[in-house]
Amino acid sequence: MALAGHCECGGIRFSVDESALLGTGYCHCSICRRLSGAPVNAWVAVDPAALAVAGAPALYRSSERGQRAFCPTCGSQLWYAPDDGSFLTLNATGFDDPEAPALRPQVHIFDADRLGWFEIADSLPRSPDGSLPGG
């Protein structure tokens, strides 16, 4: 099943088949917090080869490990791409149906960076860094 999404202004659209999803979760790192403007960022990791994009996103090198894509018109953050090209993490809230069961977060990463005043009361696995628990 195809999962589609877009930036706020609609200038950039994307889609990916559900079979290309590699994982979902919440990121508590300071970069995701600043760029999303929220205390946590919900992400969906996908195989980069499976992502179809219409429109031309702008790129921003957010760390020594990778870059972010965003809409040059409305500024919506679209995805993070590590330099090794092994995956992309799309913002879960950018999908047309962010409540689709396949997009439900399954893990917390960078939990050691979580803001002390913010807590999500769930039983999902938590990783203190960017590694996936059990991975």
Give the role of each language-model region:
Residues 1-135:
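A short Gly-Trp-Pro
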